[in-house]
A protein has these predicted regions:
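Mature, function-bearing regions of proteins
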Residues: 2-238
Length: 238
């Protein structure tokens, strides 16, 4: 089981309660833990929005500068689900908003439900700092965990090899997501996201989103890469 993630088990195909009010704002702790070939970890704060992807909020005034979620920042979720034979009438998206026009989303999560409120899929959309993205379509096991082969270069210090074990707990008053990279005999990398829902007011939104902006977090992540390089970790070819 990935570390630091706990949620109620949702067996595949069970009916879930879909009374969650969106949009919802979460303040989250994000941690990266590297276990091989050397130990290294860091943590940062981030703000996330949970939105209905088919009814994206249209912020006005000041909130347009720091609370906008755009569909073209993400994959064509409807086409992707269709390609996998998945029917979903409601899609909830957990993602970071644009701040002053800039968006940085290392991971966004889609929870996909049918008309009866049955969870049909979870999609993890991963972005790297090189402008690439890849979607991992999961059909979670009981407990909300799914697996997928790693297909995209993310960290310059991790080769494109291994299996992601992804656990995405259905959001409520809190939200929890973990991604564990597994290879035979080891789990060299784990990332976790734990968020708490905050009041959806203009003041709370501006304060939270500006304080934990994507640009700041991108610089922090890249600085951690410099630290790893200085410690002698070898860059893997793309």
């Amino acid at each position: 089981m990935p570390i630091g993630c706990s949620c109620r088990g949702i067996p595949w195909g069970d009916v879930v309660t879909m009374d969650l009010v969106v949009p919802a704002l979460y303040e989250a702790d994000v941690t990266h833990v590297r276990r091989s070939p050397l130990d290294h970890s860091f943590r940062y704060r981030a703000s996330y929005w949970l939105v209905d992807f088919d009814r994206l909020p249209q912020p006005r005034g000041l909130t347009r500068l720091c609370g906008r979620v755009r569909s073209d920042d993400h994959l064509d979720i409807r086409s992707l689900l269709s390609d996998h034979g998945i029917e979903a009438t409601r899609v909830l998206l957990l993602t970071s908003s644009r701040v002053l026009g800039y968006a940085f989303n290392p991971i966004s999560v889609f929870w996909c439900y049918d008309e009866a409120g049955t969870q049909r899929a979870v999609v993890a959309e991963v972005h790297n700092t090189y402008g690439d993205r890849h979607a991992y379509v999961l059909r979670p096991e009981p407990g909300g965990t799914g697996t997928a082969e790693k297909r995209m270069y993310v960290s310059p210090f991790n080769r494109v090899e291994g299996t992601y074990r992804i656990r995405a707990c259905e959001p409520a008053a809190s939200v929890s997501v973990s991604v564990t990279l597994e290879r035979p005999g080891e789990a060299p990398f784990v990332a976790t996201l734990h968020g708490t829902r905050r009041p959806n007011t203009t003041a709370a939104m501006v304060r939270s989103v500006v304080r934990h902006s994507g640009l700041r977090n991108r610089v922090l992540i890249q600085w951690q890469g410099v630290r790893l390089w200085r410690r002698g970790l070898r860059v893997q070819p793309r």
